Amino acid sequence: MNTIIVGTVKKINKVQTFTNEKTKKEFNKCEVIIDQNKNYKSALCIEFHQDNIDLTKRLELEHVYEFHINASSNEWNDKYYTSIDCWRIQKLD
């Protein structure tokens, strides 16, 4: 699912590295917290993976961006976890 959301960058976390136990391949991600400027619980955590992590270098705190995202869920132990993955950004202010 491709969606566009607009928000103000509030926090850019450090890049995290994970290793797949089976394949021993490394996986990188960076989480960015944005505020959608709505009244109730408007904070949202967006993830940047692998090659898209470089996009976070263009982000500036307290600036407004348009984020092109894909949302997906994965099941693990009868629980579902949702990811919001960003693949394109555009500065609006």
What is the role of each PLM region?
Residues 1-93:
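Single-stranded nucleic acid-binding surfaces, predominantly the OB-fold ssDNA-binding core
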